[in-house]
Swiss-Prot record:
GO terms for molecular function: ATP binding; beta-adrenergic receptor kinase activity; delta-type opioid receptor binding; Edg-2 lysophosphatidic acid receptor binding; G protein-coupled receptor binding; G protein-coupled receptor kinase activity; kappa-type opioid receptor binding; protein kinase activity. In contrast to other AGC family kinases, the catalytic activity is solely regulated by the binding of substrates and ligands, not by phosphorylation of the kinase domain. Residues 454-521 form the AGC-kinase C-terminal domain. It catalyses: [beta-adrenergic receptor] + ATP = [beta-adrenergic receptor]-phosphate + ADP + H(+). Interacts with the heterodimer formed by GNB1 and GNG2. Interacts with GIT1. Interacts with, and phosphorylates chemokine-stimulated CCR5. Interacts with ARRB1. Interacts with LPAR1 and LPAR2. Interacts with RALA in response to LPAR1 activation. ADRBK1 and RALA mutually inhibit each other's binding to LPAR1. Interacts with ADRB2. Specifically phosphorylates the agonist-occupied form of the beta-adrenergic and closely related receptors, probably inducing a desensitization of them. Key regulator of LPAR1 signaling. Competes with RALA for binding to LPAR1 thus affecting the signaling properties of the receptor. Desensitizes LPAR1 and LPAR2 in a phosphorylation-independent manner. Positively regulates ciliary smoothened (SMO)-dependent Hedgehog (Hh) signaling pathway by facilitating the trafficking of SMO into the cilium and the stimulation of SMO activity. GO terms for biological process: cardiac muscle contraction; cellular response to catecholamine stimulus; cellular response to chemokine; cellular response to epidermal growth factor stimulus; cellular response to glucose stimulus; cellular response to phorbol 13-acetate 12-myristate; cellular response to rapamycin; desensitization of G protein-coupled receptor signaling pathway. Residues 191-453 form the Protein kinase domain. This is Beta-adrenergic receptor kinase 1.
Length: 689
C-alpha cells in the first residue's frame, strides 16, 4: 500500500508539472480580481508619495512596461517607432553568436537609423550614430552596441509621452495591478501542495502549485516549534533576509525566493522549483566528471556567486549537495541558510561544511568576506573531478583532521589535470587570501579570465546557451521516495509551546518579491485577466450609463482623494455599508450606490483620526464630537495607509485654520449633514459646499 501511495504521489506531481509548463493559466484554481478603476485616485497618491510614479520606476517593472508598450503601440502613433526600435535592440542583445549580431546589427542600422537620417527625421544625437557606425565599420558587434540609443530612446519617452501615459486608462490598469500586488497576503490555501521532495534540519520541501496563476514552485516549510527547540530563530530569519537580497535582478543560477509567509505553526519560503536532483546525487550515479563537463558547471556557479557577491552576500556553504539541476540540466545554488551580509560588518564565525571551508573561516576570530566562497569553489571543483574533497584523504570522517589539513596541507594536483586546470585550482586553493584568485580586487572577473575558461563566451553562459553535459531523465521525480525521505518525530516537539513572544519574532516575515510576482503574472494570467476585466468594465458601462458618476463628481473641485470604503457608523447597524467617499480640505462626503442624497462630515466636527482593529482587520476610527464615531474599512493595505494619511493631513490643516479663526471655533454644528436637496452630480461650486 505504501508503494502504491508513493507511485500515486509521483504521478500527481508529474502531471501537475506537465500541465503547468503547457498552460499554467488553465491550471489556476483561483482568479485574480482587479479592483474598480476608481482605485486610481488612491493608488496614484500612494505611489506618488513613494516616488513610484516616474518613467524609470514604471518602465523598469514588467507589468509597467507591458502596459506602457500597449499604450504606445496602440494609442500613440508618434511613440510607436521608438518602442519598436527599443524592442529590436533588446532582441539583438540576447543573440547567441557574433555572426547573428553582425547580420542583425546591420538590419537595425538600416531600418531605424539610416532610414531616419536620410529622411532628416532622426531624433537621436550625433554621438550615438557615430558610436554605432564606428563599431560597424570595424565589424565590432558587442551585445551593448546600441546602448547609447537605449538611453536616448528612454529620454525621448520620458517627457510628454510619459505624461500622456499617466493620463490614460493604461495607467489606471497599472494602478489596479499594483493594488493587487501590494495587498498580497498568502496562506496555505493559495497553494496546492504535492509530494515531499526533501527534508532539512527544521522542516521539509514540497512541490506546490500557486492557485491563482498555476505556476509550480518549491515550498520550504520550517516548523516553528523545531526552530525554537534548536534555538534556530536567527538562522531562519537570516535565510529570509539573504533570499530577499539575492532574489532581485536577473540571475538564473540561484534558487531564488518569490514569496515568504507564515502560519501559526510554519515558516514558508516559496522558491524556484528544481526537478533535476543535485550534483552530489549525480556524482554518485554518474561518477566523476571530465574537465569539459566540470567547466560547464563551474561557469554557471561562478555567475551565481558573482550575483551574490555584488550584493555583499557571502554564501559559505558551497558543495555539490547544494547545487541543484533543473529539468534541462542547468544548475542553481540553493539553501542560503548559512549565507551572510558583509556590507557593514565582515563575519568571523566558523560555519560551513568541513572539507569545503576556507582557512580564514576555520581560524577563530578572523574576519572574512567573499574570499571564502572562492576557496570553497576550488574544493568543490576538485570533488567533481576526483570524487572527494582535496582535504579529505582516505575517506576520513574526522572533522578535526580535515580542518587541520585545510590549514596546513599543500594540495597536490594529479598529473592528469591540464595546465589550465592546475592554474585555476592552484589560484582558488591559495591559503593566503591576498594571493587567492577572486580576491585580488576584481572578484569573479579574475576567475572568468582564467585560461581554463578561455573557450567560453560568458554572455552565452549567462543566457544558458551551452548544452548541459547531463540532462535529468524526463517523466521521473528526481528525488527520493517520500518514505525514504522520512518525517520528523512529532514527540521531539511535543513539549514545546509557542508563545506570543515567539510569534512576534516573525511579525515582519511575510514578503513578496515584486519583480518575481510581476514576471509570474506576465507569463501566466496577465493577458487573460486584462481581457476579462476589459469586458466586465465595458459591460458595466453599457448597463449603467452613470458608471464613472462617482469620479465625475470630483472633477473640477478641490477633491483630495476619492474611492470606495465600508463604514460602520450608525448605532443601530452592525453591518458594514459600502460607500463612495470624497475627501475635501474641509469635509468628508459619501454616498451609497444608486443614491442621490449624500452625507458629509466637516473637519471641525472630527476630534481624532486613529487606527483600530475589528476582528483582526485594521480599520480607521473617526471620533466625532458628541461621543459619536465612524469606523471605516478599506479593501486593501495601500488604501488604508493612504486614507489614514490624507484624512489626518486634512484634519490637521483644518484644525490649524480653525485656530487662526477663533470665532468659528465654538460655533455649534451638526456632526453629520445629509445633503438631500440637490443631486450629487448637479452640485458644482468651486469648493464643493
Amino acid at each position: 500500500m505504501a508503494d502504491l501511495e508513493a507511485v500515486l504521489a509521483d504521478v500527481s506531481y508529474l502531471m501537475a508539472m506537465e500541465k503547468s509548463k503547457a498552460t499554467p493559466a488553465a491550471r489556476a484554481s483561483k482568479k485574480i480580481l482587479l479592483p474598480e478603476p476608481s482605485i486610481r485616485s488612491v493608488m496614484q497618491k500612494y505611489l506618488e508619495d513613494r516616488g513610484e510614479v516616474t518613467f524609470e520606476k514604471i518602465f523598469s517593472q514588467k507589468l509597467g512596461y507591458l502596459l506602457f508598450r500597449d499604450f504606445y503601440l496602440n494609442h500613440l502613433e508618434e511613440a510607436k517607432p521608438l518602442v519598436e526600435f527599443y524592442e529590436e535592440i533588446e532582441k539583438y542583445e540576447k543573440l547567441e553568436t557574433e555572426e547573428e549580431r553582425v547580420v542583425r546589427s546591420r538590419e537595425i542600422f538600416d531600418s531605424y537609423i539610416m532610414k531616419e537620417l536620410l529622411a532628416c527625421s532622426h531624433p537621436f544625437s550625433k554621438n550615438a550614430t557615430e558610436h554605432v557606425q564606428g563599431h560597424l565599420v570595424k565589424k565590432q558587434v558587442p551585445p551593448d552596441l546600441f546602448q547609447p540609443y537605449i538611453e536616448e530612446i528612454c529620454q525621448n519617452l520620458r517627457g510628454d509621452v510619459f505624461h500622456k501615459f499617466i493620463e490614460s486608462d493604461k495607467f489606471t490598469r497599472f494602478c489596479q495591478w499594483k493594488n493587487v500586488e501590494l495587498n498580497i497576503h498568502l496562506t496555505m490555501n493559495d497553494f496546492s501542495v504535492h509530494r515531499i521532495i526533501g527534508r532539512g534540519g527544521f522542516g521539509e520541501v514540497y512541490g506546490c502549485r500557486k492557485a491563482d496563476t498555476g505556476k509550480m514552485y518549491a515550498m520550504k516549510c520550517l516548523d516553528k516549534k523545531r526552530i525554537k527547540m534548536k534555538q534556530g530563530e536567527t538562522l531562519a530569519l537570516n535565510e529570509r533576509i539573504m533570499l530577499s537580497l539575492v532574489s532581485t535582478g536577473d540571475c538564473p543560477f540561484i534558487v531564488c525566493m518569490s514569496y515568504a509567509f507564515h502560519t501559526p505553526d510554519k515558516l514558508s519560503f516559496i522558491l524556484d522549483l528544481m526537478n533535476g536532483g543535485d550534483l552530489h546525487y549525480h556524482l554518485s550515479q554518474h561518477g566523476v566528471f571530465s574537465e569539459a563537463d566540470m567547466r560547464f558547471y563551474a561557469a554557471e556557479i561562478i555567475l551565481g556567486l558573482e550575483h551574490m557577491h555584488n550584493r555583499f552576500v557571502v554564501y559559505r556553504d558551497l558543495k555539490p549537495a547544494n547545487i541543484l539541476l533543473d529539468e534541462h540540466g542547468h544548475v542553481r545554488i540553493s539553501d542560503l541558510g548559512l549565507a551572510c551580509d558583509f556590507s557593514k560588518k565582515k563575519p568571523h564565525a566558523s560555519v560551513g561544511t568541513h572539507g569545503y571551508m576556507a582557512p580564514e573561516v576555520l581560524q577563530k576570530g578572523v574576519a572574512y568576506d567573499s574570499s571564502a566562497d572562492w576557496f570553497s569553489l576550488g574544493c568543490m571543483l576538485f570533488k567533481l573531478l576526483r570524487g572527494h574533497s582535496p582535504f579529505r584523504q582516505h575517506k576520513t570522517k574526522d572533522k578535526h583532521e580535515i580542518d587541520r589539513m585545510t590549514l596546513t596541507m599543500a594540495v597536490e594536483l594529479p598529473d592528469s589535470f591540464s595546465p589550465e586546470l592546475r592554474s585555476l585550482l592552484e589560484g582558488l586553493l591559495q591559503r593566503d587570501v591576498n594571493r587567492r584568485l577572486g580576491c585580488l580586487g576584481r572578484g569573479a572577473q579574475e576567475i572568468k579570465e582564467s585560461p581554463f575558461f578561455r573557450s567560453l563566451d560568458w554572455q552565452m553562459v549567462f543566457l544558458q546557451k551551452y548544452p548541459p553535459p547531463l540532462i535529468p531523465p524526463r517523466g521521473e521525480v528526481n528525488a527520493a521516495d517520500a518514505f525514504d525521505i522520512g518525517s520528523f518525530d512529532e514527540e521531539d516537539t511535543k513539549g514545546i509551546k509557542l508563545l506570543d513572544s515567539d510569534q512576534e519574532l516573525y511579525r515582519n516575515f511575510p514578503l513578496t518579491i515584486s519583480e518575481r510576482w510581476q514576471q509570474e503574472v506576465a507569463e501566466t494570467v496577465f493577458d487573460t485577466i486584462n481581457a476579462e476585466t476589459d469586458r466586465l468594465e465595458a459591460r458595466k458601462k453599457a448597463k449603467n450609463k452613470q458608471l464613472g458618476h462617482e469620479e465625475d463628481y470630483a472633477l473640477g473641485k478641490d477633491c483630495i482623494m476619492h474611492g470606495y470604503m465600508s463604514k460602520m457608523g450608525n448605532p443601530f447597524l452592525t453591518q458594514w455599508q459600502r460607500r463612495y467617499f470624497y475627501l475635501f480640505p474641509n469635509r468628508l462626503e459619501w454616498r451609497g450606490e444608486d443614491e442621490a442624497p449624500q452625507s458629509l462630515l466637516t473637519m471641525e466636527e472630527i476630534q481624532s483620526v486613529e487606527e483600530t482593529q475589528i476582528k483582526e482587520r485594521k480599520c480607521l476610527l473617526l471620533k466625532i464630537r458628541g461621543g459619536k464615531q465612524f469606523v471605516l474599512q478599506c479593501d486593501s493595505d495601500p488604501e488604508l495607509v493612504q486614507w489614514k494619511k490624507e484624512l489626518r493631513d486634512a484634519y490637521r490643516e483644518a484644525q490649524q485654520l480653525v485656530q487662526r479663526v477663533p470665532k468659528m471655533k465654538n460655533k455649534p454644528r451638526s456632526p453629520v449633514v445629509e445633503l438631500s436637496k440637490v443631486p450629487l452630480i448637479q452640485r458644482g461650486s468651486a469648493n464643493g459646499l
